[in-house]
């Protein structure tokens, strides 16, 4: 029993011991397996390190090999350079030897020429005396002269030995034969000696490259030879710097030819240097400014052939090209090869596509985008080809400005475009409206289009603060305030004044000076705009007592310009007949017309952008509505007479109808109440009524006669024979001037006769000179009133010859358009006005 109990008690101990042994074995296995894994990892790491070391060693060996190869190449290049230098030295030595030989031969020729000069000029006593004083040993016999001729022939052959080795024997034989013949004939006939000697002298002169007469050469042999020696020495120095081939070929050439060849070699080397520099930029396609190097005749993307360059700008350049697919001329804007310009051009393409899609009928004066592509890392924008810009138009008027009638046409079209851009569907701010960005569609028409949307943006995507050209920059941009569509309206106001006056309205040299120019005309901006401006302290000083602002002095200007106020009415010339009275007594430039123009400009140039006039309000302004005052005096008088006659006829008809009605009513009353109607008109007898009607008719006839007499007097004043003759003379002069100008846009007679499509035409008479000294003819043909308007101008020119001579071609007659009041976008363009 005890043993069983003990065995029972020992059983758990035995189990524990067995479990411990098992766990120990397991721990040992885990330990050894971990050791084995660590060993394997260590071995793998060691292998990886060894591989890395091997790779590094291989790379180092490869680098060493490359360095050795570079060293070998450098050594080879040095050896080649040394060999080239040795060859050059040898060539220079050969050249020097050849030049020394040439000089010796040339000196021999000089002596021989001096000997021959006495023979050739026996009849010229003056020449012989000159040679006797300079060379006393030159007086020899005929036989000795014949010997000298033989020497000359030999010397000439020696000169030819340098370049023509194969022809030596032939030349020597011919020359020796000639000399033998001369020796046989010399003693008999001296005249033959003279001829032969002249031939020899001509040969010598050919070697020296003198093409003058024989006598003059003989008179100045010594001086010319000395000069030739000096020139040869100079040529030697030049030839040492040039190639060997040129030196060998230039031994028998003129000094001028040697210099020309040397110059060409140097220029070619400089061109090579330039090509090496240019090859650094976009594989040689671009210049240092990242602009594409345009080559005339080059074809872009197998479609557009470059015709000519139209201009350059900060964005890149514009070229004229021919589209081989559409068979038309186009303009290509080649953007610079820089990322900022590329990204901005993408925005311009997106905006043009948006506006063109919203305007499929091309009514709203925005340039048409035709295509765009990338060519040699340059983004290219293809648009329709237009004509001159408004600045070119202004320059061709010699900066005298254009008439209000033409400004009315331009302003109406630009406002049409601005209204279209301000619609919610388009929502585009141009941000750079100026005369250079407004182009004529045709040089003979007043239709325009707006271009260059490279700075444009949506009203809710304003990216830049520094926008607009300085002369046309709005005050909110100068003061760094928030801006909207109204900045384009400010620019338009500045443009319209400049187009009429001929000079920029606000021409500041910097931002502070620009603000000064604006304040001179429009006074200080509102205080709330200055208060909210981050540049207030830069431009203004605030009075702490009165809380008023004053403009700071401009210290950056080189010249001290005193602050002086100007009136906008004086700049435009409202009361003086235009700027410098250039438009005085012209049709369409009356005081009322100028007052309307001034009112429109003042509303465009209001400081507060919220109070500034909108495009739709501007289109409804009275400046664009036709009035009697805006028409020529003759048309006014004719219209007045027509209106008066119409009124009189209406009055007559009304009186007759009233009399009939009264007679009918009076008869009724008289039948009913014959006693009580004594005071009524019906109480009068029919005879009295007829007398009254006759008197009224007589009065009307007298008034009509007076009006006709007044019209005849006006016609006699305007259509006098002298004015008609002067008018025809003026037309003849214009036609003669057009015959002289052979440019395609200078046919004035066509403009005077062409009145089918456009009653208001702009004509730029452009020459091909760089200065573009052209005349601009703004011709208006109004069917039956062409000569009426011309006669008015002739009368004005006769009264003001000194003032209006410069404007005979610039200020012709123009009629203002008749745009209606436009409430909607669809009704924006006039339906019955095709003259724009």
UniProtKB/Swiss-Prot annotation:
Has UniProt tagged this entry with the keyword Transcription?
Answer: no
Is the Cytoplasm keyword given for this protein?
no
Q: What is its EC number?
A: 2.7.12.1
Keywords attached to this entry: ATP-binding, Kinase, Nucleotide-binding, Serine/threonine-protein kinase, Transferase
Per its UniProt entry, which superkingdom is the organism in? Eukaryota
One Gene Ontology cellular component term attached to this UniProt record is: nucleus
Annotated Low complexity bias: 99-278, 630-697, 785-816
Ranges for domain Protein kinase: 304-624
Which cysteines are disulphide-bonded?
A: none
The positions annotated for binding ATP are 310-318, 333
Q: Family per UniProt? A: Belongs to the protein kinase superfamily. CMGC Ser/Thr protein kinase family. MNB/DYRK subfamily.
Name this polypeptide is given? Probable serine/threonine-protein kinase dyrk1
